[in-house]
A protein has these predicted regions:
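Glycoside hydrolase catalytic-domain context in secreted enzymes
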Residues: 1-203
Length: 203
């Protein structure tokens, strides 16, 4: 009703941060169900979550974003999930296989190589076009259900500068000083500070 879709993450067995983009969570089915997916099951069945973010890691030798057992057999077939699966940032390893096995949206985008992989897979028959169409339909169902698109096709206008100002204000007001070594703060008037990096230009 508020135009928002919840997105629980990271599905699933993302149990450590060290080498999480490459590690393999080897886990038996009972442990996987009872420990690693119960929270997601509740979010889908009771919370009606419309989006799930897949994790970087492999689960029993298959990357989560391409894992049919997780994305189709458990998430859709058993739990009745009717939303879309989004990869973690750069978390798609095999673009076509991800689409084939239940992934919908790749972040931050497929890029040229990803698009070429998907087109090639459709042309050689490893990714049926109807599966690609189905993923698009499933994704658009959430877009329309959350009123993120308008019927007249004009789309919504966003106040980029206003949103930027709000984000900056939120960041400024949420800063917490944990340590003040040698009483360096507050800075004395006239003190020079070097701000380096992307956020120096656009805070």
């Amino acid at each position: 009703s508020k135009g928002i879709a919840a997105c629980p993450k990271h599905f699933a067995a993302n149990s450590q941060e060290l080498r999480r983009m490459a590690n393999d969570s080897v886990v038996d089915e009972r442990t996987f169900r009872e420990i690693y997916t119960t929270g997601f099951e509740i979010a889908v069945k009771e919370g009606k979550a419309k989006s799930i973010m897949s994790s970087y890691n492999e689960v029993n030798g298959v990357y989560a974003n391409e894992n049919r057992h997780m994305l189709q057999e458990i998430l859709v077939d058993e739990w009745g999930f009717d939303g879309y699966v989004v990869s973690d940032w750069g978390g798609s390893n095999d673009h076509a296989l991800g689409v084939m096995n239940g992934s919908h949206l790749e972040m931050p985008g497929t890029g040229k190589s990803g698009m070429r992989d998907i087109v090639r897979a459709v042309k050689d028959g490893t990714l049926p076009e109807e599966v690609l169409d189905q993923r698009l339909d499933e994704l658009l169902n959430v877009v329309f259900a959350t009123h993120q698109a308008t019927v007249d096709g004009k789309g919504k206008k966003f106040d980029v500068e206003g949103h930027h100002a709000l984000a900056r204000k939120a960041a400024e007001e949420s800063v917490v000083l944990l340590k003040n070594s040698n009483n360096i703060l507050p800075l004395k008037p006239g003190t020079k500070v070097a701000v380096i990096g992307d956020f120096a230009k656009t805070p």
